Amino acid sequence: MGPGKEKFALITGCGDGGIGHALANNFVQNGFIVIATLLPHESRTHLEHAKIHVIDLDVTKEDQMIPFRSTLEEITGGTLDVLVNNAGICYTMTAADTDVKQVEKMFAVNVFGPMRLVHHLHRMLIAAPRGVIVNIGSIGGVCPYVFGASYNATKAALHHWGNTLRVEMKPFGVHVVNIISGEVATNILKSDVRDNRTLPEDSVYAPLAQLFKDHVNRTPDAMSPDDYARGVVAMVQRRSLPAWFWHGNATGFIWTLDSFFPRTIWDWLFTRWFKLENLVGTQG
């Protein structure tokens, strides 16, 4: 991204202490003017900066998109250098015990939100000297992380949609990067804790109820949001951009296993990590 022109970055989901918050700060430190979105009820004092414009946006609401784009065009003059599809929510549960209504909500934010934003903003990215779309994905979209089947599915969908988007936008000079994120110390898991997420009493996984509870309440060994954001912002400004950018704790390990080992390596690992062998013979 060359000098001499104001650069604009739009980041969705910029709640206090999360990846979006850290990205907003780091983009500003690198000379960008940032447009940060929040839900109407969220505090915004953490985003008080002359170069950060805060706009209310629920990425699941189609009727908010046209007014949002108009406001965005007024700020940027009609172009957009970087779109970061960061807004996301999490839901922890076994695949068999999944509440589909919860999953529908998660897909609405994690998958349909990015689709909606690209649909409405792609011309602004094309109009920029070098438009970049960044999708905040996850290692969960690559490996079968136990108790995360539905979240994993949203990220796998985002990755594959992003892959096709990358190919389709290339003729217009717009780059698309999927970030394959490892563990980052954010608030995304707190909704499970707040909702006191537990296994159903009649679940076939009931023998693992305590392990599930401990998993929900865990404190991951995670990269800080600021370290994560610095890596992403530096990557966005490279001359040559990757299709996938693996970033965050455990990504090197996950990449190695996914690249060089049989697919069933995950079965072996996760069965042992989550003590699934303890379920053998408990039904029937």
Swiss-Prot record:
The active site is at residues 151, 155. Induction: Expression is increased in rice-extract medium (REM) and is correlated with the production of pyriculol. Pfam families: adh_short. GO terms for cellular component: endoplasmic reticulum; lipid droplet. It is an enzyme of class 1 (oxidoreductase). One of its GO terms (molecular function) is acylglycerone-phosphate reductase (NADP+) activity. Belongs to the short-chain dehydrogenases/reductases (SDR) family. Short-chain dehydrogenase; part of the gene cluster that mediates the biosynthesis of pyriculol and pyriculariol, two heptaketides that induce lesion formation upon application on rice leaves but are dispensable for pathogenicity. The highly reducing polyketide synthase synthesizes the heptaketide backbone of pyriculol and pyriculariol. Pyriculol and pyriculariol contain several hydroxyl moieties and double bonds, so it can be assumed that several reduction steps occur during biosynthesis. PANTHER family: NADPH-DEPENDENT 1-ACYLDIHYDROXYACETONE PHOSPHATE REDUCTASE (PTHR44169), SHORT-CHAIN DEHYDROGENASE SRDE (PTHR44169:SF3). This is Short-chain dehydrogenase RED1. The lineage of its organism: Eukaryota, Fungi, Dikarya, Ascomycota, Pezizomycotina.
